[in-house]
Every structure is written in C-alpha cells, then in structure tokens.
Amino acid sequence: MPRDYSLDKVRNIGIMAHIDAGKTTTTERILFYTGKVHKLGEVHEGTATMDWMVQEQERGITITSAATTCYWKGHKINIIDTPGHVDFTVEVERSLRILDGAVAVFSAKEGVEPQSETVWRQADKYHVPRIAYVNKMDIIGADFFNVIKMIKERLGANPVAIQIPIGKEDTFRGIVDLIKMEAIIYEDDLGTVMDETEIPDDLKDLAEEYREKLLEAVSEQDETILEKYLEGEEITEEEIHKALRKGTINGELVPVVCGSSYKNKGIQPMLDAIVRYLPSPLDLPPVKGMALATGEEIERKADDSEPFSALAFKIMADPYVGKLAFFRVYSGTLNAGSYVLNSTKGKKERISRILQMHANHRQEMEAVYTGDIAAAVGLKDTTTGDTLCDENHPILLESMDFPEPVISVAIEPKTKAAQEKMTTALLKLAEEDPTFKTYTDQETGQTIIAGMGELHLEIIVDRLRREFNVDCNVGKPQVAYKETITKPVKIEGKFIRQSGGRGQYGHVWLEMEPAPRGEGYTFENRIVGGVIPKEYIPAVDAGVQEAMQNGVLGGYPVIDVKVALVDGSYHEVDSSDMAFKIAGSIAFKEGMKKANPVLLEPIMKVEVVVPEEYMGDIIGDINARRGRVEGMEARAGAQVIRAFVPLAEMFGYATDLRSKTQGRGTYTMQFHHYEEVPKNIADQILEKK
C-alpha cells in the first residue's frame, strides 16, 4: 500500500488551551468540517446534520482518543490531544514532544490565563511553531485586540493578526481576511454558508491599519517583500503566505485568527491557516538519538527510505482490542505484522495490527510511513516514552523525563470481592500514566496509589468507578516523603551460612555517597581481578535496590545515592546470586545508618493570582506554610505571587484561599524538587510513623 499523502502535505498538530477556552468544542468542530468535506461526494444536504448527531454520540472517541486523523484541502492532519489542567502538565509535555506545530486557543474574554502561560512556555522549550485562535468572540466581554496585546506582553510572543472580527458579542457575524482584504460573513448557524463580500464601511480604516501591521511583519521575513513594501508596490497573497509560513516555522511570529467554535464561525479559515503556516515533518530538523552499539549521537531524517524509528507517546486500554500504544513515526516505514525492537527495554516486539483513529471510526492500516501517528496493537512490554526501531539499525531516541509522584493515598474496594478487580485495574492505569504508581505498603498491607496532585488521584478513583466498576474508599492524602544520605561511607556486607549441606556465601564492600538532588540512583562496578565473579554483580545491584525501597528512618524510599561495589570475596561452591543479593542489601542498610540519613519532602512551585488588596494576607500565609516567595508581578488588575511551598503545607489550600480572598483568588501548583525537611519537623513526622 503506497503512501496516500506526500510528506509535505502532513501536519501533526496539537490544540493547546486553558480549561475554559473551548478546546473540546474547537476540536469537535474541526472534525465535523474536515469529515464533511472529506465525504462531500456522498453527503446530500439532508444528511449533514444527521452526520453531526452521530458525531455527537460518538463524541467520547474524539475527546479521549490520543490522536485523531482528519483531512483538509488535500492535506492530512493528525490532531494530538493535550489536556488543559495543570496536574497533567506531564501529558502536555509528552504530546509536545511528538507534535510539529500547535494551535493555541484563547478565550476572547479572559485571554492569557496562568495555565495558558505554563503550556506556552512548555511549547517554547520544544520550539513548537504555533498559530493563535481567539475563540468565543460571541460572548459578553469579548475583546480580540486585548487578547493580541496580552499575547505580546505576557507571553513575549510576536502575534500578527491575519483577520479581524466583524462585530463582537451577540453581533459577531464574520471576519475580515487581511490578506485578501475581503469580508467573510456567515449566513447560517451551521457555518457552512459563507458570503465573501466587501469590507463593511465602518471597518475599513481598522482593516487598513491591521493590514499595514501584517505587511510590516512579513516584510521582516523576506527581502523582496521589504523592497516592494518600501517602494509601495503591490504584494501578492502568495508572497504573504510564504513569508508568514517562514516566520511561523522559525518561531519569529504567531499568526492570529478568530472565531466562535460554539457558533460554528471561523473554523474553515483556521484550518486554512493550519495547512498554510504550520510545518510538515520535512520542515523540521532531523530527529536525534543514540546508536546503541557505540553510544554516539546519530540522526534520522524524515524520509521513508531511512531505517524505521518511532516514539511511543501514550498507552491506552481499549475495551475492544486490549492495549493500544500510540506512536509517532520519525523515519522509515512499518508494516502491520512485522517485528520491531523496543530499544529502551532491549526487547523484540511484534506489531499485530496498526490502527488510525478518525472522528467516529477506526481504520486498519497495512503500513505507516514517516510522519504518521497511529496506534499499535500487540506491544506487550512497551510503555510511554519508549523507542521503537528497526532491529538491524537500532537507535535510542531521547526519552521523556517523568517526575516522581508526590502525593499518595491508601485505597480499598468497598467490597472484599472486588480486591482483585481493583488491583488489575490499577495496574492498567499505571501502564497508561507514567506519573501514577501503585504499590502495597509493607507494614500495613494497604494498597497505596501515588500521583502528581489531589486532582490527579481523584480522576484515577473516578476512572476506577466509571471504567472498571470498582467503588473504592480512599484515605487521607499523604505526602510522598523520601530518604537520602548526606555523607560518604565505606561498608561491609556479609551473608554466610555454612553449617553442613549446601551453604550460602556472599561478601561485599560498598562505597556509598550522596548524589546531587534529582540524580536518582547509580551503581558502579569497581571490582578488579575477579574477586567477585561477573555473574554475581547484577545480584548485588538488585539487593541494594531492594533495600532502597524502605529507608532506615521511616521506611520511605531512598533516592539520590551513588553506590560503588569496590571489593569482596566469594566461595567456589557456596556462593550464589541469592547470597550476593542479601549481602548487598545488608551492606546498604548498615551503610545508610552510618551515612547521616535525612528525610526529604516534595516542594511545589505555587502561583497564586489575587486582587491587590489581599496580597499582604496571602504572602503572610505562604510564609506561615514554610514557603519562600520567589517573585511578584502585576497582571491585568491582579497580583501574581510565585513561591516554593512544601506540599505537606498545601493540603486544603483551595478552601483557605477562597475564604481569605472571598472567592477571588486562584492558584496553580506543580511539583518542582525534593528538599531536606527541617530537623524539628522531621522528628514530628517520624514520631507519627
């Protein structure tokens, strides 16, 4: 099966937005118009609305599918879903990794909100070209020009309006296209009957003013346009499109369009802007990775003839086909039924089927090509962030970093009978979401779930009920404390049982030292001259890691430690993996006691937005919660306070903030780093344990 769309006609985009900007409606409308245009041949006037109802019913698919494919004017568009809530910034990061471009949706009333800033900065980090869509032009308080000002001031971007609205609030009825210099007026509620006419008289001056700004912006991108502009010559539509595309892809400007998704206005021109200005996989630099054999950096060009390489970016449990692994192909092609190497795990996997999701149906694919996004059935060991590649040309693409969970709760099913069902469901959910973990507390035997915030865990519990029919009781949220060491030690570990029969003999010397915060655990083998045979070394490492699950202070996991195996001895007959594993474990536990162990707690990056008159109270409150205020700034009539606060002090903050600001304050927080707990507080925590 040959490729159906050439690579320059493929767009992989995300729709980024704050929760209330209207992302879902916008996505649905895109799918509606693209689906309808794609099926023009068979849709008679009467069935269009019918089709729309089916889509409404199938809406579940469009919203939850990690990637949906649709078509517009000879282009193939893959839309990757990005959530808007701050507990899910990890989801946003992982979708931005595999996108080529994005549409940032803003509400015409609120404009740039704190969460839109977070997402925008993440997109900056991955250099994602984007266009802005100012939605909700029909609501009270809509102000297109104010949003442009906010994009410039708050996001430090260079917004260039390529349209201006005709009317606003309940009189919003169309747009002025500043490139063609004509008006598009919507005649019906479905937004399919459009009238292209002259610009209304009362908007001519404004249109001229914004056309000038547009021409200034594009002339900076292109010498020939600049000369024509200065000479006062006519600049063609084609030249404007070309310069806008160049500026968007190199991140120097952001084309801005407007509309009302709910009222079906402005969607088609936005789709035109997606295919005109956002990049295809060919417009971006080759993807970089590491050659497994040599450890050198290598790259893969976006080309079907290159060896196959792809990144799995989301795992979903599907009621019909089991586990779906969504992946993005960076190079080469892949046929259904073939084998790939999961180079992250070092395992060969067979892809039994390949599916592509459309608005209301899924399509079986015989093959996928460079730039495609699809879902694979049959991958058993693949998890989020893994590289899939051609086994004869292995490459390891840069994986995604996922933060450790910072909050945990005990959970139990309401009926004993549902225990097994709950355990299976939790493991499935943990497979989908790398920032969600589930384990059993060694001391109490309770099942513990851990995640990135209270909302994150609430949603997990809700999914248990909705998708797996398991009702659960949930304990009080607990902070995920960790332990570490603060000074280097050298320690001996012996496990020797030699009293008749088969004995046990394991003997190791370890050097332990603190690692920089956030580095995690490293194990180094410094054995020389075979004092411990090679085959027992991994067992020592495993023993150390097992001991790290429960620290010596309060049984919390141990992080940020460097361990080196430096010496030891073995016995020809009695030594075994088991003996060395136990010796490694004993040595680590003993060493940790001597290495000044300390307790660590998660520190959250908190952003509070409050009216000025409450600022003193709120800062006082943050200090009382052991917080450090990092900075403040004024933002649209309110003050933004940025601070680092221990998670332990943030429980119930939403309620406190509401009462302190009469419901006018809002806040967002996300995990930032781990830090040592002050001694007096650590003592209190460990006493309660």
UniProtKB/Swiss-Prot annotation:
Gene3D superfamilies: 3.30.230.10, 3.30.70.240, Elongation Factor G (Translational Gtpase), domain 3, P-loop containing nucleotide triphosphate hydrolases, Translation factors
UniProt GO molecular function: GTP binding; GTPase activity; translation elongation factor activity
Primary localisation category: cytoplasm
InterPro entries xrefs: EF-G-like_DII (IPR053905), EFG_II (IPR041095), EFG_III (IPR009022), EFG_III/V (IPR035647), EFG_IV (IPR047872), EFG_V (IPR035649), EFG_V-like (IPR000640), G_TR_CS (IPR031157)
Keyword Nucleotide-binding in annotation: yes
A Pfam family recorded for this sequence: EF-G_D2
Segments forming domain tr-type G: 8-282
Location(s) in or outside the cell: Cytoplasm
Gene Ontology CC annotations of this record: cytoplasm
Keywords, in A-Z order: Cytoplasm, Elongation factor, GTP-binding, Nucleotide-binding, Protein biosynthesis
Residues annotated as binding GTP: 17-24, 81-85, 135-138
Any GO BP annotation: ribosome disassembly
Protein purpose: Catalyzes the GTP-dependent ribosomal translocation step during translation elongation. During this step, the ribosome changes from the pre-translocational (PRE) to the post-translocational (POST) state as the newly formed A-site-bound peptidyl-tRNA and P-site-bound deacylated tRNA move to the P and E sites, respectively. Catalyzes the coordinated movement of the two tRNA molecules, the mRNA and conformational changes in the ribosome.
Protein family according to the UniProt entry: Belongs to the TRAFAC class translation factor GTPase superfamily. Classic translation factor GTPase family. EF-G/EF-2 subfamily.
NCBIfam families: EF-G, PRK12740.1-3, PRK12740.1-5, PRK13351.1-1, small_GTP
Protein name: Elongation factor G
Lineage of source species: Bacteria, Bacillati, Bacillota, Clostridia, Thermoanaerobacterales
